[in-house]
Curated annotation (Swiss-Prot):
Protein name, per record: Progonadoliberin-1
Any single GO CC term annotated in Swiss-Prot or TrEMBL for this entry: extracellular space
InterPro entries: GnRH, Gonadoliberin, Gonadoliberin_I_precursor
Family: Belongs to the GnRH family.
């Protein structure tokens, strides 16, 4: 029974690979063989830019302030760490 099951799985895998390998996928603006028309590509990029005029900077899209969030996290980590060190009796001395 084991050889029949393994043969069935092998047949299914081969059929799946063959079905994906024999298909031709078409996309908007693509010619057969994967050759692209460069004029339509620039038009497509222009359309994308026109649809998102507010996306000039990452902060305008994400709504963040001028300062990235990473320094804030490190300052918060240092603040929390210094508080827990004091609670445990540790002191930090600056030179």
């Amino acid at each position: 029974m084991a050889p029949q099951t393994s043969n069935l799985w092998l047949l299914l895998v081969v059929m799946m690979v063959m079905s994906q390998g024999c298909c031709q996928h078409w996309s908007y603006g693509l010619s057969p063989g994967g050759k692209r028309d460069l004029d339509s590509l620039s038009d497509t990029l222009g359309d994308i830019i026109e649809r998102f005029p507010h996306a000039d900077s990452p902060c305008s899209v994400l709504g963040c302030a001028e300062e990235p969030p990473f320094p804030k996290m490190y300052r918060m980590k240092g603040f929390i760490g210094s508080g827990t060190d004091r609670d445990n009796g540790h002191r930090t001395y600056k030179k």
